[in-house]
């Protein structure tokens, strides 16, 4: 969702903490993160498709993607900080769930069959986890400051 001038004006009037990053940083950060997400999801869905991973492993990844794309609509489309806060908490929760599930299944498969471990995906997603953790704290703070 592209920010029009009304949305930009609305967002710029919100109270933000002093440690809030400048607006220009979000584009480059999300570009890198979406590349990581694409590789991660592509790998996971391919492994599910080829039956190297169980179908259920895709659930937290699908939910994470839905919540991730919903955030922009809640925050900038509806201009609703509370819904955006709930959504980003769900993004963080499903991300942790997805990576933990992948780790558990990968470890079990590796130990029982000798299949290669997929823990590289967890390591590749550390920037995503860190950014979403930071963004969650930022969004909750913005919501609190503007209640």
Question: What do the predicted segments below correspond to?
Answer:
Residues 100-130:
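Interfacial loop-to-transmembrane junctions
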Residues 39-43, 74, 93-105:
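Alpha-helical transmembrane segments in multipass membrane proteins, preferentially the mid-helix core
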């Amino acid at each position: 969702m592209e920010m029009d001038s009304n949305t930009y004006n609305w967002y710029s009037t919100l109270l933000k903490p002093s440690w809030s990053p400048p607006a220009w940083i979000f584009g480059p950060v999300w570009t890198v993160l979406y590349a990581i997400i694409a590789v991660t999801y592509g790998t996971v869905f391919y492994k599910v498709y080829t039956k190297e991973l169980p179908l259920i492993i895709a659930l937290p990844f699908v939910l994470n993607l839905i919540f991730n794309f919903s955030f922009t609509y809640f925050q900038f489309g509806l201009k609703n900080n509370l819904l955006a806060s709930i959504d980003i908490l769900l993004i963080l929760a499903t991300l942790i769930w997805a990576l933990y599930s992948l780790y558990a299944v990968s470890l079990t498969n590796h130990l029982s069959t000798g299949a290669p471990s997929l823990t590289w995906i967890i390591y590749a997603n550390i920037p995503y986890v860190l950014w979403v953790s930071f963004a969650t704290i930022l969004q909750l703070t913005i919501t609190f400051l503007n209640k």
